[in-house]
Amino acid sequence: DELRDLIRGVGIHELAAVLEEVEDDVVADVIQQLEPDQQAETLAQLDRGDEVAELLQYGGESAGGLMSRGFVTLNEDISVQQAIDYLRVLRPPSDRVYYLYVVDSVGHLQGTVSIRDLIVSSPRTSLAEITQRDVHAVTANTDQEEAALTLQKYNLLAIPVVDDEGILEGVMTADDLIDVLQEEATEDMYRMVGLDE
């Protein structure tokens, strides 16, 4: 109701301008609360409307619905020096780079590589040689609580989200998943005492 009041006050165009500054998963959450005609109009005004629309196809309680597309991928066929050069050009925000994800030419998740390993490895070394292949991932349809528990179990800062073929789709961060665990714990507590939220 507050969101609908806000839209009446500022309009779809202004809402879209504000949403341009927010992560895709948050934008998707906001758009899900709009009426269908407002959803379509807002998506049409967003520069990254197609990406947000893809997130909307997943349930809000799934890993796909909560994932962010703000992550860095590196192709396993490049050298360490090429990876470093790419990162220098890309200049990803430090608050988004928990892991560097290594993919094959099709986009299948192969593993992760740390910035430390990039720095200490020979520039000519293939990224495939230093990739940590023991990576824990969830599928886009995984329930958010299960994804949060996986992240917690392995003490990760972020967990990659893949499709059914293993292609990297997005990343869920610990920040997102801590909120999920808190919500789930609250729901469980209410159920235990016989109350609904």
Feature names for model-found ranges:
Residues 1-192:
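Hydrophobic packing positions in regular secondary-structure scaffolds
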Residues 195-197:
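Cytosolic juxtamembrane amphipathic/interface segments immediately preceding
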